[in-house]
Amino acid sequence: MLEQMECPTIAVVDGAALGGGTELALCTDIRVCTKDAIFGLPETGLAIIPGAGGTQRLPRLIGISKAKELIFTGDKVTADAALSMGLVNHVCQDFNLATEKAIEIAKKIGEKGPIAIRAAKKAIDGGEADDLKKGLELEDKQYQKVLNTEDRLEGLKAFAEKRKPVYHGK
């Protein structure tokens, strides 16, 4: 996984990063996006939950209350809102500028002592590692519970048919 890499990781997000796209970005240390970027975890609208770490990483990054709201509602988040809540570090006008910003940050990090950078990353990440591991195991268990429900099938069917799903709690 990205977060297990010894070196810092930087994501550049341009456009929609919904569901797994947001979850992938959450795995990185630093996130830079364009002004047109959109984030969100819409899985509950399909009668499933974020299953790639979103329920564990998002609350750690932006706080439990806001994370619950975003996961429960499936609301989309604009780039500026993502910046204000701490979901991203920088918002740039376009992809080229976002990429330049990411490279600038990477170069700045590259000028620092590599052993110190690795140690700092390990110390920061290690502060919650055991809790994160348990949380990810719990998320996977809950994801498996919803994976084979009739509601999930209805959610996927409704999505494909571009209509609102009708759930029955089964």
Residue ranges and their predicted role:
Residues 1-4, 12, 18-72, 85, ...:
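CoA-thioester-processing core
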Residues 70-71, 120-123, 159:
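Short alpha-helical scaffolding segments that buttress acidic/His motifs in well-ordered protein cores
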Residues 32-37, 79, 88-137, 141-150, ...:
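C-terminal long alpha-helix characteristic of the crotonase
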Residues 155-170:
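Short, basic/aromatic-enriched C-terminal tail that caps enzymatic domains
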Residues 54-57, 66, 116-119, 139-142, ...:
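Hydrophobic alpha-helical segments typical of transmembrane helices
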Residues 76:
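Short aromatic/basic micro-patch
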